[in-house]
Regions:
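Non-ligating segments of multi-cofactor redox enzymes
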Residues: 1-251, 256-280
Length: 280
């Protein structure tokens, strides 16, 4: 079965998300263990290699790539898939964003925080700039400690590994847990961390935006000829990538933020949202 057919037939993403969690997170850690790691830090980390090193940009970048080669390969694979098929990693397989979304669904709606008023791309790429240059400004270590790719695996592994529970009880561990809780578990849609703070999401969003300009790539798109402007998809979008400007009759999609989850398509009464190539 081709990946596009699989994407179109799956009614629920959660089986894929659970599979991603089983592969990457404790207690199984199946993929990290293949390269000698116990969590998503070290060689498996898909984020830390992006931080500029004080050793020098070129030599530091090479050192980062060598140290975190699996994470580099993972990000490269994600970007290739995103270019041709949309952000399937973020919406269907990422164990971190998937965990915050699933846990968030267990929390009552009245306790949820809406981040929809935040200009996500502006915030995301501002933070991304700080993240990349963090070592020079002394913030690299802090970004690592607050990273959801650290907090979620430690949280999942804390019942099995006392050291993880001990870390989460420290001031830095609690700060990281609070960051993930507010921007993940208690965020409306469960994906505010993904949309505003994730460095992988930042580069993945750029790949999705740029590749959407090509007619041969397959993305989640809106057919303006069918859109009735009801706005139901806007309220469904977990990353507030859909807007209904007052001056227009149709919904606008921000491909920098869209994670290709297709939840909007499920809520569209007019069938205006589809997954495929750009219509001519």
């Amino acid at each position: 079965m081709r990946i596009t057919e699989l994407f179109g037939r799956v009614k629920h993403r959660y089986l894929f998300i659970l599979a991603g969690m089983l592969l990457f997170l404790p207690p199984l850690n199946l993929i990290p263990q293949t390269v000698g790691e116990t969590n998503m830090c070290g060689k498996v980390c898909p984020r830390l290699f992006l931080i500029l090193s004080t050793k020098g940009i070129a030599s530091g970048a090479l050192s980062n790539v060598q140290a975190m080669w699996f994470g580099v390969g993972l990000v490269a694979t994600v970007l290739i898939i995103t270019f041709f098929f949309g952000r399937l990693w973020c919406s269907h397989l990422c164990p971190i964003g998937g965990a915050t979304e699933l846990i968030g669904r267990l929390i009552p709606a009245r306790l949820k925080i809406s981040f929809a008023k935040i200009d996500a791309p502006a915030f995301r790429y501002g933070y991304f700039a700080v993240f990349v240059a963090g070592a020079y400004w002394g913030a690299g270590n802090i970004a690592c400690k607050l990273c959801s790719y650290r907090v979620i695996p430690f949280l999942a592994g804390s019942p099995f590994e006392p050291a993880y529970a001990a870390y989460l009880s420290t001031s830095m561990g609690m700060a990281g847990l609070l960051t993930v809780a507010l921007s993940g578990f208690f965020a409306k849609g469960g994906r505010a961390y993904c949309n505003c703070l994730c460095p992988v999401g930042a580069v993945d969003g750029l790949a999705n935006y740029l590749s959407s300009k090509f007619g041969f790539t397959k993305k989640v798109r809106t057919d303006p000829g069918k859109c009735v402007g009801c706005g139901q998809c806007v309220t469904t979008c977990m990353v507030w990538a859909l807007k209904k400007p007052e001056a227009t009759e149709t919904v606008q999609r921000d491909t920098l933020s869209c994670v290709s989850c297709m939840e909007c398509a499920k809520s569209c009464p007019a069938g205006a949202i589809y997954y495929g190539k750009r219509q001519k």
